[in-house]
């Protein structure tokens, strides 16, 4: 593979994470406008966005097999067509059923693209470089989460229709489409007919189970925590909307800075050991936040939490890809699917807890989930295969 082709494939991966981040995080910015557009209460409108998460989950799960049947390039080109149709449907459709269908299609496109982007990074890069590259790729999710809410706020403040926000997000897929046309993709499964020695199927091992549980609990814990921080800060400490929102902003800012830092630092550490340390520190920082009696300390704790937890999820995925000698798209997508399930379960799990016991109980539950992540990382240390396969080398 030429260096120029490797760079193009890497940028496709970057943009794939940015696309998913923009679609998921911008939801809160446009929900009120969409509810007004359809003349529905915002509580009812929020349920329709489940179609977006469902589309992401279904496509990531199925693409573990589809990647070996349908060429990656063809999938991305077809995804561009679906993206255009979905955005057009949002613009011309004035029906809630059409809106829900378009959200599902956007989720499918996003999930397919992100699963391909993740596989490309795990396929192109090896050893510790794989972890640092995947972490830098994941930072584009957060960057999109910072940039597109600003774009959305600017457009909505100028009374521009909400669907133009999704048209702006579509520009990311336009970049993916252009890069796709210029790139050569690795062939998988039956497509790889040129290989003289077919790759022997490898057993995943129990380590993948530990990693999958950790990925699900991490995402569920993270989103369950950050979604209820504003409510907790307002009720417990009497913070204003601006102050409680600032806590969330501090978390994501520190999270992105942490991603950039660890994308370099991870090259010098064994991934299983460092993710165990980070999980322990994250559990401790979240405990300090949840148990703090001083509102002035909350910003410091949440900044620390965002920084030390930023590398956990992508490191779990990287370790998963290293449990086999040759990176398996099915294995990577399985761990991604578990993380996506955690996303979908966020309000299913935390909603009843908040209704029954308040936001503090939801944060305490998230803290418990982070503790589970730490335990899974410790158990992984006894069974991991990444050192056996030589992936621990620089």
Curated annotation (Swiss-Prot):
Record protein name field: Protein TsgA homolog
Its main subcellular localisation, reduced to a broad class, is membrane
By sequence similarity, the record places it as follows: Belongs to the major facilitator superfamily. TsgA family.
**Species name for this entry?**
Edwardsiella ictaluri (strain 93-146)
Q: Does the keyword Secreted apply?
A: no
Q: Which parts pass through the membrane?
A: 11-31, 51-71, 76-96, 101-121, 134-154, 160-180, 206-226, 246-266, 274-294, 297-317, 334-354, 363-383
Superkingdom of source:
Bacteria
- Provide GO CC annotations from the record: plasma membrane
Q: Which PROSITE patterns match?
A: MFS
Sorted UniProt keywords:
Cell inner membrane, Cell membrane, Membrane, Transmembrane, Transmembrane helix
Source species taxonomy: Bacteria, Pseudomonadati, Pseudomonadota, Gammaproteobacteria, Enterobacterales
Where found? Answer: Cell inner membrane
The record's annotation in SUPFAM superfamilies points to: MFS general substrate transporter
Keyword match Cell inner membrane: yes
A Pfam family of this chain: MFS_1
Q: How does it sit in the membrane?
A: Multi-pass membrane protein
Q: Which GO terms describe its molecular function?
A: transmembrane transporter activity
Q: Which InterPro entries match?
A: MFS, MFS_dom, MFS_trans_sf, MFS_TsgA, MFS_TsgA-like
């Amino acid at each position: 593979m030429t260096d120029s082709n490797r760079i193009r494939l890497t940028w496709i991966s970057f943009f794939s994470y940015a696309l998913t981040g923009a679609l998921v995080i911008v939801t809160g910015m446009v929900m009120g406008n969409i509810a007004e557009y359809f003349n529905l209460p915002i509580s009812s409108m929020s349920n329709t966005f489940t179609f977006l998460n469902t589309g992401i989950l279904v496509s990531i799960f199925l693409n573990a097999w589809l990647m070996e049947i349908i060429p990656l390039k063809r999938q991305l080109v077809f995804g561009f067509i679906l993206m255009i149709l979905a955005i057009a449907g949002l613009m011309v459709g004035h029906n809630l059923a059409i809106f829900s269908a378009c959200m599902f299609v956007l989720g499918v496109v996003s999930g397919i693209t992100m699963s391909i982007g993740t596989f490309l990074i795990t396929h192109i890069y090896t050893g510790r470089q794989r972890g640092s590259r995947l972490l830098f790729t994941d930072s584009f999710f957060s960057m999109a989460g910072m940039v597109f809410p600003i774009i959305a706020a600017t457009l909505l403040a100028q009374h521009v229709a909400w669907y133009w926000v999704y048209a702006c997000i579509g520009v990311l897929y336009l970049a993916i489409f252009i890069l796709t046309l210029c790139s050569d993709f690795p062939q998988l499964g039956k497509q790889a007919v040129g290989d003289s020695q077919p790759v022997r199927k490898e057993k995943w091992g129990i380590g993948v189970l530990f990693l999958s549980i950790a990925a699900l609990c991490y995402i569920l814990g993270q989103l369950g925590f950050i979604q209820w921080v504003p409510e907790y800060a307002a009720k417990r400490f009497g913070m204003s909307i601006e102050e409680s929102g600032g806590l969330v902003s501090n978390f994501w800012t520190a999270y992105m800075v942490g991603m950039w830092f660890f994308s370099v630092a991870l090259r010098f550490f064994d991934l299983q050991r460092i993710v165990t340390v980070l999980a322990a520190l994250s559990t401790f920082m979240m405990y300090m936040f949840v148990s703090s009696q001083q509102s002035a300390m909350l910003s410091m704790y949440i900044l620390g939490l965002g920084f030390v937890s930023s590398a956990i999820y992508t490191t779990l995925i990287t370790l998963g890809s290293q449990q086999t000698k040759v990176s398996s798209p099915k294995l990577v997508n399985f761990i991604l699917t578990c993380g996506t399930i955690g996303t979908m379960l966020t309000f299913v799990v935390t909603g009843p807890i908040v209704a029954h016991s308040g936001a503090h109980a939801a944060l305490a539950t998230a803290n418990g989930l982070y503790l589970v992540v730490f335990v899974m990382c410790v158990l992984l240390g006894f069974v991991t295969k990444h050192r056996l396969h030589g992936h621990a080398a620089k």
